[in-house]
C-alpha cells in the first residue's frame, strides 16, 4: 500500500483537489474499518463548519480502485434517482461524493495514493455495537431498503471489484494453501482451529454451490453489512442510509443478511479473547431479521428466504476462515493491533458459528415468522 507523509498541509491539498472551499481547520483520523485509511476533515465556510470524509483506498485490497468508484457512483446515483422519483429530497438519504477537478470521483495523489472525498451527512451517527433492539431493527431496515431500491438495477453493469469475494470454495483453497506453505511458522500453534474449520467446510460452501446451480439469484449486494455502516438520524433514531460501499457487487441476499448477523448479533466483540462470552443473541437476530425481511419479503424467492439463516452461519465461517488464513500468511490483509489479533478474531468467529449451529432451528423459525 502507498505510504504518504500525512500533514495538515497534505490533507488540505488533497481536499482542494475536490473543489472544497473555505478555511481548513483540522482533521481527525477515523479508526473504524480494517481496510482503508480515513480522515474527517473540517473546513469553515459561510459562517459554519463543514465536514468531509477523506479516504485513501487500499490498493492492495482493491486492485482496480477506478472500478470501485464507478460502482459506487453508479449505485448512489441510481438510489438518488429512485428517492427523487418519490418526491423526497435525497440529501441525507444517500452518500454524495465530491468530483475532482477533472470531473472524476477520485484523485491520484503525488505519491500514487488513490483518494476520494464525500460529504458527512448532517446530524447523523453510527453505532459500532449496540444492545438497543430498535436500532438493530432499523439497521435491518436500512440494508433491506438498500437492496429494495436496487432491485431493478442491472446487476451485469457492476464490476466485480474483488473476484471470488464470497466464493467459499476458493476461500477454503486459500486456507489450505496457507496451511501447507506455513510461511510464518504459525500452523503448529493452531492445529485445533485448523481442524475445526476443516470439519465445517461442507456447510460453509453450501450456498455458493446453490448459486452455481442456479438455485439462488445474484443481486446487487453491499457485502459489508455491519451496523457501523448505517447512518442514523441523531434526533429520531431512524436509519438514513448505508455507507462504505467499496464492496458493492453482485452477490447473494443471504450473504448480506448473514454478514450483518455475525456482527450485530454476536454477544461479544469481534476479537473477544474469552470465548465463553461469544454467543448468538437471538433477540438481536430477531430484531434485525424483522427489519430486513420486512423491507424485502415481497421480492425474495423461497430459496432466498430459506437460506437467510444459513447465510449467517456461512458468513461467520467465511470471515473466521479469512482471519485464520491471514494469520497464517503473516497478517498481510487485515489491519491488526497486536501479533495474534487475527487469531483471536478467527477463534471468536468459530465459537459464534458453532453456537449458530446449535440454534439453527430457532434462527430459521424467526426468519419464517417475518419473511412470510
Descriptions of predicted regions:
Residues 228-269:
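Catalytic activation segment of kinase domains across protein kinase-like and atypical kinase folds
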Residues 305-315:
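Small/polar glycine-rich anion-binding or flexible loop at a beta-alpha turn
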Amino acid at each position: 500500500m502507498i505510504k504518504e507523509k500525512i500533514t495538515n498541509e497534505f490533507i488540505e491539498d488533497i481536499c482542494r483537489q475536490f473543489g472544497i472551499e473555505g478555511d481548513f481547520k483540522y482533521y481527525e483520523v477515523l479508526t473504524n474499518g480494517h481496510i482503508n485509511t480515513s480522515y474527517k476533515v473540517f473546513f469553515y465556510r459561510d459562517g459554519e463548519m463543514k465536514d468531509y470524509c477523506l479516504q485513501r483506498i487500499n490498493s492492495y485490497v482493491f486492485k482496480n480502485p477506478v472500478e470501485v468508484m464507478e460502482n459506487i457512483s453508479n449505485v448512489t446515483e441510481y438510489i438518488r434517482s429512485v428517492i427523487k422519483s418519490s418526491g423526497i429530497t435525497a440529501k441525507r438519504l444517500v452518500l454524495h461524493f465530491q468530483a475532482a477537478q477533472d470531473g472524476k470521483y477520485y484523485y491520484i495523489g503525488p505519491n500514487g495514493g488513490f483518494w476520494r472525498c464525500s460529504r458527512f451527512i448532517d446530524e447523523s451517527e453510527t453505532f459500532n455495537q449496540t444492545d438497543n433492539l430498535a436500532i438493530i431493527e432499523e439497521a435491518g431496515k436500512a440494508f433491506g431498503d438498500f437492496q429494495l431500491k436496487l432491485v431493478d438495477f442491472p446487476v451485469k453493469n457492476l464490476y466485480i471489484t474483488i473476484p471470488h469475494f464470497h466464493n467459499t470454495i476458493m476461500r477454503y483453497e486459500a486456507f489450505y494453501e496457507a496451511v501447507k506453505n506455513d510461511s510464518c511458522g504459525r500452523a503448529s500453534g493452531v492445529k485445533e482451529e485448523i481442524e475445526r474449520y476443516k470439519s465445517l467446510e461442507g456447510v460453509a460452501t453450501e450456498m455458493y454451490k446453490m448459486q452455481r446451480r442456479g438455485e439462488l439469484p445474484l443481486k446487487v449486494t453491499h457485502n459489508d453489512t455491519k451496523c457501523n455502516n448505517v447512518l442514523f438520524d441523531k434526533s429520531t433514531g431512524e436509519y438514513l442510509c448505508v455507507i462504505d460501499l467499496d464492496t458493492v457487487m453482485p452477490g447473494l441476499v443471504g450473504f448480506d443478511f448473514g454478514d450483518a448477523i455475525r456482527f450485530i448479533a454476536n454477544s461479544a466483540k469481534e476479537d473477544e479473547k474469552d470465548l465463553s462470552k461469544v454467543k448468538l443473541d437471538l433477540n438481536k437476530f430477531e430484531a434485525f431479521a424483522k427489519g430486513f425481511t420486512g423491507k424485502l419479503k415481497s421480492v425474495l424467492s423461497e430459496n432466498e428466504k430459506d437460506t437467510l439463516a444459513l447465510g449467517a452461519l456461512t458468513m461467520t465461517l467465511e470471515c473466521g476462515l479469512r482471519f485464520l488464513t491471514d494469520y497464517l500468511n503473516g497478517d498481510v490483509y487485515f489491519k491488526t493491533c497486536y501479533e495474534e489479533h487475527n487469531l483471536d478474531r478467527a477463534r471468536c468467529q468459530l465459537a459464534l458459528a458453532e453456537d449458530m449451529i446449535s440454534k439453527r432451528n430457532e434462527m430459521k423459525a424467526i426468519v419464517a415468522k417475518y419473511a412470510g
